[in-house]
C-alpha cells in the first residue's frame, strides 16, 4: 500500500489534462483514449496505479476520485461515450476498501481496538462494532481490519479499512452530495453541527463544500445524460434512498441565495435537473412547482402572485455580462416544454394543467424580462451573446406557438398550449 498522499492534485491534474476533453479537442479522440485505458491499460498495475490509489484513498481524499472518474468517462459536450462511461461506473460500483477519518468524538466508546502485529508497517485496528461512515447512510461492519495510512501523530488520523464485501463509491458520492445541499432535520440543533459537518468525511469539504458539491453534480449529470439506459441503471443502483432531484433543486437555490450569486452552483443544478428529466419527470415537477427556480430566483412562489416576477440570476448576469446560467435555464424550460408536449395526452389532465401553469409563469417571465431589450445588454464573454439568447428564446416561443393544441377550440379544460399562451 503506498503511503498516504495528502495532496494528489498534481497527479490528478496531469491525468485530467490527458483524458479530459478541452475546448478545441476532438471528442472522438478523447473517447478513444479513454477506451484504450479501460480495455487495455487497466490490466497493467503500473498504468492503473493512480486510479487504484485514489480508489483506496476515497473518501478521505474525496475530490481526486471524482475528478479522475470524470476525466476517464470520455464524455464531452454533445459527444457522449456510453462504453467508457459504463466502464467508469463499474469501477466506482465495486470498491474493496475505504479510507476514513477516525472520529475522535467516539474514541472513548471502544468502537475499535489497536492490534499488536509483528512486522506491521503501521498501526493496525479492528472494529469492535459497526462504524458509521460520516455524512452517509453506510456502515463499516464490526470485525473489519484497518491500517493507519496518515503520518503517525498527524491529525486527523486516517485509516484504510479492508472490506470483506465491496461497497459502491456511488452511494458515498450520492449521500455526501445530498446531505451537503439538502438541509437535515437536525441542522438547527447546535449539538448536531459537528456530526453533520462534511469535513468528518473528507478534509476536501473544508471551506469548499460548494465547489465539491458542484463537481459531484457535474459527474452525475454527465453520466445520466450519456444514455438513458445507463442513467436508469445508475438510479436503480442508488436504490430507494436516491434523492438527486431535491438535491439538484437545493443546489440551484443555494447558488441563487448566495452573496454574491454563485453561477457555477446554479448552472450545475440546472444541468443535473435536465439530465434527470427523462428519468424522473414527476419528481422534478413536484419539486419545482412551488419554487422560483424556473425564473432564476431563490425561495418559494408567493400565494398571491399577480405580478411578473424578477430574477436574481438575470439581474446578476446582466451586471456581469456573462449569461451562462440564463442560457442553461432557457434550455431547461425548453426541455420541460418538450416533456409536456410529449405527455399531454397520456398524463391525467389535472396533472398536465398544473405543469402547464407552472411553465406558463416561467415562459411569461422570459417574454417579459428577457425578450424586449436583450439586444441592448452588455455581453462580456461573447459579443454575439445576444444572438444565442435570441435563439433560445425563439426556440422556446416557437415550440409553444406551433403546438397543434392551438388549433382546437378552448374549453373549460383548456389544453396546455392554451394555458401557456
Sequence positions of predicted segments:
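Extended alpha-helical scaffold regions
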Residues: 1-421
Amino acid at each position: 500500500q503506498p503511503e498516504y498522499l495528502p495532496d494528489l492534485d498534481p497527479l490528478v491534474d496531469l491525468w485530467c489534462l490527458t483524458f479530459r476533453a478541452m475546448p478545441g479537442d476532438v471528442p472522438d479522440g478523447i473517447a478513444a483514449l479513454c477506451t484504450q485505458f479501460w480495455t487495455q491499460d487497466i490490466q497493467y498495475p503500473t498504468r492503473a496505479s493512480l486510479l487504484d490509489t485514489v480508489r483506496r484513498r476515497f473518501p478521505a481524499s474525496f475530490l481526486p476520485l471524482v475528478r479522475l472518474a470524470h476525466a476517464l468517462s470520455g464524455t464531452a459536450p454533445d459527444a457522449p461515450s456510453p462504453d467508457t462511461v459504463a466502464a467508469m461506473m463499474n469501477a466506482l460500483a465495486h470498491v474493496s476498501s475505504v479510507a476514513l477519518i477516525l472520529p475522535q468524538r467516539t474514541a472513548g466508546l471502544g468502537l475499535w481496538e489497536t492490534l499488536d502485529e509483528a512486522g506491521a508497517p503501521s498501526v493496525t485496528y479492528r472494529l469492535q462494532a459497526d462504524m458509521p461512515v460520516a455524512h452517509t447512510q453506510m456502515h463499516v461492519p464490526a470485525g473489519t481490519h484497518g491500517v493507519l495510512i496518515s503520518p503517525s501523530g498527524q491529525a486527523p488520523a486516517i485509516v484504510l479499512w479492508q472490506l470483506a464485501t465491496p461497497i459502491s463509491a456511488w452511494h458515498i458520492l450520492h449521500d455526501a452530495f445530498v446531505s451537503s445541499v439538502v438541509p437535515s432535520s437536525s441542522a438547527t440543533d447546535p449539538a448536531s453541527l459537528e456530526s453533520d459537518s462534511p469535513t468528518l468525511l473528507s478534509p476536501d469539504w473544508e471551506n469548499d463544500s460548494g465547489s465539491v458539491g458542484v463537481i459531484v453534480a457535474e459527474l452525475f449529470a454527465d453520466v445520466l445524460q450519456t444514455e438513458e439506459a445507463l442513467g436508469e441503471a445508475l438510479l436503480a443502483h442508488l436504490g430507494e434512498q436516491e434523492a438527486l432531484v431535491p438535491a439538484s433543486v437545493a443546489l440551484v437555490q443555494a447558488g441563487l441565495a448566495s452573496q454574491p450569486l454563485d453561477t457555477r452552483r446554479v448552472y450545475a443544478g440546472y444541468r443535473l435537473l435536465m439530465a434527470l428529466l427523462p428519468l424522473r419527470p414527476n419528481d422534478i415537477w413536484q419539486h419545482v412547482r412551488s419554487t422560483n427556480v424556473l425564473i432564476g430566483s431563490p425561495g418559494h412562489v408567493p400565494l398571491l402572485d399577480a405580478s411578473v416576477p424578477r430574477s436574481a440570476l438575470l439581474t446578476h448576469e446582466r451586471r456581469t455580462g456573462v449569461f451562462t446560467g440564463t442560457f442553461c435555464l432557457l434550455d431547461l424550460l425548453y426541455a420541460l416544454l418538450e416533456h409536456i408536449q410529449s405527455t399531454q395526452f397520456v398524463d391525467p389532465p389535472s396533472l398536465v394543467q398544473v405543469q402547464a401553469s407552472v411553465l406558463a409563469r416561467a415562459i411569461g417571465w422570459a417574454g417579459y424580462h428577457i425578450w424586449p431589450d436583450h439586444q441592448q445588454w452588455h455581453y462580456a464573454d461573447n459579443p454575439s451573446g445576444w444572438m444565442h439568447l435570441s435563439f433560445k428564446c425563439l426556440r422556446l416561443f416557437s415550440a409553444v406557438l406551433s403546438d397543434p393544441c392551438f388549433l382546437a377550440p378552448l374549453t373549460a379544460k383548456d389544453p396546455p398550449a392554451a394555458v401557456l399562451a
